[in-house]
Curated annotation (Swiss-Prot):
Protein's UniProt name: C-1-tetrahydrofolate synthase, cytoplasmic
Residues annotated with N-acetylmethionine modification: M1
Lineage: Eukaryota, Metazoa, Chordata, Craniata, Vertebrata
Subunit structure as annotated in this protein's UniProt entry: Homodimer.
Localisation per UniProt entry: Cytoplasm
One GO cellular component term noted in the UniProt record for this chain: cytosol
């Protein structure tokens, strides 16, 4: 018989490594910046372990795998080792890791516990019980296989010998080689016998094997005469035996008597140079496979997501009854379904979570999805259902059309929840759940804003007080105190010096004039624009006097409280793009002017760093879900009058990355299109750089009848008869407002889909009329929606229209150039969006325009603060008013947020409580802790 063919593991492993190197390059081309990651955790300092690890690190480097070696001391305890295992499990840059065995520690460590703490999806050694169990069950495509058996199988396949139907004998039953080798051969359809130290007549059992794999750790235990002629022999052993002919006095042999066996076998592995190189190659292959699985799971593509099926009832139950009839998915599960990593999600219980900004950094190279903004016609006081339409649309796109889709909505103020409004999270079968969480504290963002805002207010009045009661020198000594004999400026004080043109860093080097300029802000109390805030409707805080305690030495002034969401910090949160950007915006917030007319900022007050600390968690978007299980970001809730009325840029950006290029992100703009949509485009999109693909314009028969001359609609009172009976004439006359809002949207170059939010009293004839007129006047489409009563199914036609519109050509453009004067920018909005003949800047507004321009704020975008109940400044004028001049009473600046807001009329920033507030109905069941009466 001819000598056996040599199975050279070095040659085969080199081929595998070259293939892996190509695969790594391909992954990096698909996802720039991505690198497969391998970590090796070692305890102790065994020489043999060090040798093996160095071989693995070198192989990883050659292939392009980022390998990390974590070496713990011999004093490590089991709990310390487990902490490292857990941290590697949570590290998204590590796609596979191994614990180098044996664990060389002075302390007793349960090796099995350490191995089984490894996340199975990162267990590239294939040693966890879960991977071993999957291998035993034959789930070869859903597990990692121990590297040595996997390498042995590759060598067997190299022979060309068919495994299926052959009799394979495995000598050895270790968890690392023998046992998994048995399973691997079995599921490759061999008939397998496993032999071990208790096997009788071992030589006879070995002689039956067409394929023989030996892993006993006994030098040359298997003799040549035992081997069946023509067998394939795989020798996994590495043993050292004495050899006087070798320089070190020993040689390496396998578990098989090689010289004898090669005369009987058809193929045989040498030792060394056989199985050893394959083990390392298979570790690299498993790491690359793990990285590929990671990419497949987390790169944009169709989500594998479970939707909730609605149990629709007629008549439609109350919002809270519907909300409680649907059990939300665990928010951690939803996060995984949409491609978020564990370390990118901070859970707040089972139904809400914060998403870290690191997700945006990870996905920065991924293309964005389609961007849809939901707005409406000029509403009745009852609202026309923008929020409900937003949620219904995403439920339709997700649960019914199986598109990746995200809703991005504002967080409601808690004040109105207990006042006149009650809860708000959509309605009917189109809601965000749980509604109790949505409407109350959520994750504390508004509380953080309240704390930050009031810290600024306290800093302003304290600074005025201290400047009035101290000399320059005393003030300077307290601002820059000597600590242990050393006096130095803080970082924020250094920045103030630079703004003043003072380049010195030694406090002792300042002149008297420089001390005066540095220490005194010289705030003019009459110019203070910063107010304290509270997230409670309290009319008696609309005007207050502060400083009446004797300790304030008579330094009183008139001030007020606003509701928390009216704070500029809320607008900053909504418009910021990163933690660094938020820090800069908070510092830029102007709170007053000095007596010389210079703007005083939070950076001047020295408080901007502290504000950032208070807001560090609030910047992370809040993840919730709809009734049908689609994801929702609830983040930021600025007023839609004195601010821009849109949810956060950060939430939109993360969502656009997560849905991928074929997915949709649907966000809502407050009030009608003339206010919320205009600000969405000219402020939010200007700062974000994002370009919307579709405008969804919500309209109701009810609102059109009002604009057509119908009776007054009053919140809390029954609708007049005209609104519950068919009246085509009123609808057609009122269409003028919808026509104008379609025109407004198209002015920005974006396709418009009209969503006719249907009520049970609306007739098909009325809805058909609205649809026809909308299409005739430039709408891409107009569709009837019944999502309040039917959930996503009721918005299916709308979703399909949005899909089509997103493919239509668009040419997005902003309305005005920032370089124009403040007056000209206001005029463009008034004339083009509202239909005014002109504007009139009243004296105070004229003065402010000049001051802000002089202070360098004239190039900010404009955020008009006017009534949402009319296109004009008069809420009683419905339809499309003409022939009016828009009066601008005042202009104020939100410099940190980044806009000027002209006041048209009087804007209330602190709601009051009605005679019968909603809190009469709100209570808690002490046994179930269920909130009652919120909706």
């Amino acid at each position: 018989m001819a000598p056996a063919g040599i199975l050279n593991g070095k040659v085969v492993s080199a081929q595998i490594r070259n293939r892996l190197k190509t695969q790594v390059t391909q992954m990096q081309e698909q996802v720039p910046g991505f690198t497969p990651g391998l970590a090796i955790l070692q305890v102790g300092d065994r020489d043999d372990s060090n040798l093996y690890i160095n071989v693995k690190l070198k192989a990883a480097q050659e292939i392009g795998i980022k390998a990390t070696h974590i070496k713990l001391p011999r004093t490590s305890t089991e709990s310390e080792v487990l902490k490292y295992v857990i941290s590697l499990n949570e590290d998204a840059t590590v796609h596979g890791f191994i614990v180098q065995l044996p664990l060389d520690s002075e302390n007793s460590i349960n090796t099995e516990a350490v191995i089984n703490a490894i996340a199975p999806e990162k267990d590239v050694d294939g040693l966890t019980s879960i991977n071993a169990g999957k291998l035993a069950r034959g789930d070869l495509k859903d597990c990692f296989i121990p590297c040595t058996p996997k390498g042995c199988l590759e060598l067997i396949k190299e022979t060309g010998v068919q495994i299926a139907g052959r009799h394979a004998v495995v000598v050895g039953r270790s968890k690392i080689v023998g046992a998994p080798m048995h399973d691997l051969l079995l599921w490759n359809n061999a008939t397998v016998t496993t032999c071990h130290s208790k096997t009788a007549d071992l030589d006879k059992e070995v002689n039956k094997g067409d394929i023989l794999v030996v892993a006993t750790g006994q030098p040359e235990m298997v003799k040549g005469e035992w081997i069946k002629p023509g067998a394939v022999v795989i020798d996994c052993g590495i043993n050292y035996v004495p050899d006087d002919t070798k320089p070190n006095g020993r040689k390496v042999v396998g578990d098989v008597a090689y010289d004898e066996a090669k005369e009987k076998a058809s193929f045989i592995t040498p030792v060394p140079g056989g199985v050893g190189p394959m083990t390392v190659a298979m570790l690299m292959q498993s790491t690359v496979e793990s990285a590929q699985r990671f990419l497949k799971k987390f790169k944009p593509g169709k989500w594998t997501i479970q939707y909730n099926k609605l149990n629709l009832k007629t008549p439609v139950p109350s919002d809270i009854a519907i909300s409680r009839s649907c059990k939300p998915k665990l928010i951690g599960n939803l996060a995984r379904e949409i491609g978020l990593l564990t370390e990118e999600v901070e859970l707040y219980g089972e139904t809400k979570a914060k998403v870290l900004l690191s997700a945006l950094d990870r996905l920065k190279h991924q293309p964005d999805g389609k961007y849809v903004v939901v707005t409406g016609i000029t509403p009745t006081p009852l609202g026309e259902g923008k929020s409900t339409t937003t949620i219904g649309l995403v439920q339709a796109l997700g649960a019914h059309l199986h598109q990746n889709v995200f809703a991005c909505v504002r967080q409601p103020s808690q004040g109105p929840t207990f006042g006149i409004k009650g809860g708000a999270a959509g309605g009917g079968y189109s809601q965000v759940i749980p509604m109790e969480e949505f409407n109350l504290h959520l994750t504390g963002d508004i509380h953080a804003i309240t704390a930050a805002n009031n810290l600024v207010a306290a800093a302003i009045d304290a600074r005025i007080f201290h400047e009035l009661t101290q000399t320059d020198k005393a003030l300077f000594n307290r601002l820059v105190p000597s600590v242990n004999g050393v006096r130095k400026f803080s970082d924020i004080q250094i920045r103030r010096l630079r703004r003043l043109g003072i380049e010195k860093t030694d406090p002792a080097a300042l002149t008297d004039d420089e001390i005066n300029r540095f220490a005194r802000l010289d705030i003019d109390p009459e110019t203070i624009t910063w107010q304290r805030v509270l997230d409670t409707n309290d009319r008696f805080l609309r005007k207050i006097t502060i400083g009446q305690a004797p300790t304030e030495k008579g330094h009183t002034r008139t001030a007020q409280f606003d509701i928390s969401v009216a704070s500029e910090i809320m607008a900053v949160l909504a418009l910021t793009s990163s933690l660094e950007d938020m820090r800069a915006r908070l510092g830029k917030m102007v709170v007053a002017s000095s007596k010389k007319g210079e703007p005083i900022s939070c950076e001047d007050l020295g408080v901007s760093g502290a504000l950032t600390v208070l807001m560090k968690d609030a910047i992370k978007p809040n993840l919730m879900q709809t009734l049908e299980g689609t994801p929702v970001f609830v983040h930021a809730g600025p007023f839609a009058n004195i601010a821009h009325g849109n949810s956060s840029i950060i939430a939109d950006r993360i969502a656009l990355k997560l849905v991928g290029p074929e997915g949709f992100v649907v966000t809502e703009a407050g009030f009608g299109a003339d206010i919320g949509m205009e600000k969405f485009f000219n402020i939010k999109c200007r700062y974000s750089g994002l370009q919307p693909h579709v405008v969804v314009l919500v309209a109701t028969v009810r609102a059109l009848k009002m604009h057509g001359g119908g009776p007054t609609v009053t919140a809390g009172l029954p609708l007049p008869k005209a609104y519950t009976e068919e009246d085509l004439d009123l609808v057609e006359k009122g269409f003028s407002n919808l026509r104008k809002q379609i025109e407004n949207a198209r002015m920005f170059g974006v396709p418009v889909v009209v969503a006719m939010n249907a009520f049970k009293t609306d007739t098909d004839t009325e809805l058909d009329l609205i649809g026809r007129l909308s299409r005739e006047h430039g709408a891409f489409d107009a569709v009837k929606c019944t999502h309040w009563a039917e959930g996503g199914q009721g918005a299916l036609a709308l979703a399909q229209a949005v899909q089509r519109a997103s493919q239509a050509p668009s040419s997005f453009q902003l309305l005005y150039d920032l370089k124009l004067s403040v007056e000209d920018k206001i005029r463009i909005i008034a004339q083009k969006i509202y239909g005014a003949d002109d504007i009139e800047l009243l004296p105070e507004a004229q003065n402010k325009a000049e001051i802000y321009t002089k202070q360098g704020f004239g190039n900010l975008p404009i955020c008009m603060a006017k009534t949402h109940l009319s296109l004009s400044h008069n809420p009683e004028q419905k339809g499309v008013p003409t022939g009016f001049v828009l009066p601008i009473r005042d202009i104020r600046a939100s410099v940190g947020a980044g806009f000027l807001y002209p006041l048209v009329g009087t804007m209330s920033t602190m709601p009051g409580l009605p005679t019968r507030p909603c809190f009469y109905d709100i209570d808690l069941d002490p046994e179930t802790e269920q909130v009652n009466g919120l909706f």
